[in-house]
């Protein structure tokens, strides 16, 4: 039986939980900043100093991961332009998403793809049409999860940075070739 995935906006009360997750090796491998730096970013989001919207996702009421949405138009400033020049090639109303599973024991259980699909449904209901995600090409587990959720690599864009596989969500799954 599939368990229910729910999404909830993150609050300051969730910071200790996130700090614990961020200290785990599977998280730190793909989110390069140290825990205190990441918590600072989250405090900026929660305080309205950053337009990124942070959420937790839960499995049957138990928090198991973090997901966020950011506006591409807001990323067209330094240092993001240097790190991700492809943001200039996307529509102004495009959004990007990032996510991570919290507890290591929840990895490779289809939770990430299900949470991402639920998040995309929420974003579609809010009117977003262009939704992208940019995993590290070496993160095969994440790429598989994103593909299950309907994301596909998009053609090489002018100025795309190495170390980034840009993927876009498609409303209908593409036939595997």
Q: For each of these PLM feature ranges, what is it?
A:
Residues 1-4, 9-44, 64, 173-177:
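A short, well-structured alpha-helix characteristic of acyl/acetyltransferase catalytic modules
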Residues 41-44, 81-88, 154-155:
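Short, P/G- and charge-enriched loop/turn segments at secondary-structure junctions
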Residues 45-49:
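Short loop/turn motifs at secondary-structure junctions and domain boundaries
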Residues 56, 62-71, 96:
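Conserved beta-strand in the GNAT
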Residues 71-99, 105-107:
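Conserved acyl-donor/pantetheine-binding loop and adjacent beta-alpha core of acyl/acetyltransferases
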Residues 73-74, 134, 147, 152-166:
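Conserved catalytic-core motifs of GNAT/GCN5-like acyltransferases
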Residues 108-125, 144-148:
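Conserved acetyl-CoA-binding loop-helix of GNAT-fold acetyltransferases
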Residues 124, 133-143, 159-163, 170:
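Conserved beta-strand-loop-alpha-helix junction that forms the acyl-donor binding cleft
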């Amino acid at each position: 039986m599939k368990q229910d995935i729910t999404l909830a906006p993150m609050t300051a009360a969730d910071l200790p939980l996130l700090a614990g997750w961020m200290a785990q090796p599977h998280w730190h491998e793909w989110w390069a900043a140290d825990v205190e730096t990441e918590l600072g970013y989250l405090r900026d989001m929660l305080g309205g100093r950053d337009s990124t919207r942070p959420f937790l996702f839960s499995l049957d009421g138990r928090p198991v991961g973090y997901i966020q949405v950011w506006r591409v138009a807001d990323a067209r400033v330094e240092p993001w332009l240097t790190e991700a020049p492809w943001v200039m090639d996307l529509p102004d109303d495009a959004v990007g998403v990032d996510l991570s599973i919290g507890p290591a024991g929840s990895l490779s259980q289809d939770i990430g793809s299900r949470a991402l699909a639920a998040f995309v449904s929420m974003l579609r209901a809010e009117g977003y049409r262009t939704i992208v995600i940019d995993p590290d090409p070496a993160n095969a587990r994440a790429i598989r999860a994103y593909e299950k959720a309907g994301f596909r690599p998009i053609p090489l864009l002018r100025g795309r940075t190495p170390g980034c596989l840009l993927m876009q969500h498609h409303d209908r799954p593409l036939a595997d070739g």
